[in-house]
């Protein structure tokens, strides 16, 4: 899982090499896939150059795509800048309306949200998007249910908490909530649910922390990296690993 990564260069190349070294089944992003402004002219160099073999259908310049899609992004604020995210929507083939959607891999059900204020279906807890999520979480039979978005509901980073997105995820049945936007790594615990901020995916600008929230358990900003998430029916393991291989954080959610 990578976030705030979409800047072609050495930093992203190092993160991509780390992710490839794991031999992951698929890749999930927490947004800002294509800096600086989500343009069609930069999207393949910022994404396909590093991850084309996970994308289906892939029609870019950097090699062969996958036989099935194994790349699942979320929209970040930078992705919206050009033509209301149309280059992103054209580049990827995703489920549902493509702005927010869900998919299942093994025992894990992913719910990928559109957290920017430009989202036509809204981002507040009474929005159409929130109603979709509440219903979809309730209907899911998966062992684990992960909610992924760009803007963090809670963060001790530069942008801070995004109050509009503080939906009752725990009450609705989410196992964990993952976001980006702040170029840091943080793990917080709210209502016994882990919230992760994962924004060190390759943007050269790393943010500082502000006053830590009371719910903040782990904070890190020294180097780029990615999250490795592994799951079976018994447990989910979340790790944040730097490009040098240091495991900064490891958190386990175990079944009852």
Sequence positions of predicted segments:
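N-terminal active-site segment of His-dependent metallophosphoesterases
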Residues: 1-46, 135, 155-156
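Active-site glycine-centered loops adjacent to acidic/histidine catalytic or metal-binding residues
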Residues: 4, 31-32, 76-77, 150, ...
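Extended active-site neighborhood of metal-dependent phosphoesterases/phosphodiesterases
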Residues: 40-144, 162-176, 182-232
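Short, well-ordered beta-to-alpha junction loops that form the rim of enzyme active sites
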Residues: 115, 149-152, 181, 241
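Short acidic, glycine-rich surface-loop motifs adjacent to enzyme active sites
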Residues: 140-156
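Active-site His/acidic residue clusters
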Residues: 156-162
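A short C-terminal boundary segment appended to hydrolase-like catalytic domains
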Residues: 218-256
């Amino acid at each position: 899982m990578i976030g705030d990564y979409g800047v072609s260069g050495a930093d992203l190349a190092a993160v991509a090499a780390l992710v490839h070294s794991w031999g992951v089944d698929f890749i999930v992003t927490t947004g800002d896939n294509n800096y600086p402004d989500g343009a069609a002219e930069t999207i393949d160099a910022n994404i396909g150059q590093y991850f084309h073999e996970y994308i289906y259908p892939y029609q870019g310049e950097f090699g062969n795509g996958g036989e099935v899609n194994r790349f699942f992004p979320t929209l970040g604020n930078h992705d919206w800048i050009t033509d209301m995210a149309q280059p992103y929507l054209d580049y990827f083939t995703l489920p549902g309306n493509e702005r927010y959607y869900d998919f299942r891999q093994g025992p894990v059900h992913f719910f990928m949200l559109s957290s920017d204020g430009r989202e036509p279906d809204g981002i507040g807890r009474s929005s159409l998007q929130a109603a979709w999520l509440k219903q979809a979480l309730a209907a899911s039979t998966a062992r684990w249910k992960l909610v992924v978005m760009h803007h963090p509901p809670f963060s001790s980073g530069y942008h801070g908490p995004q109050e509009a997105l503080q939906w009752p995820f725990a009450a609705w049945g989410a196992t964990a909530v993952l976001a980006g936007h702040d170029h840091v790594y943080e793990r917080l615990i709210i209502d016994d649910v882990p919230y992760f901020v994962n924004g060190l995916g390759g943007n050269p600008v790393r943010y500082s922390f502000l006053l830590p929230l009371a719910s903040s358990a782990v904070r890190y900003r020294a180097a780029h990296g990615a999250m490795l998430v592994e799951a079976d029916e018994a447990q989910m393991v979340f790790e944040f690993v730097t490009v040098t291989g240091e495991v900064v954080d490891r958190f386990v959610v175990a079944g009852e």
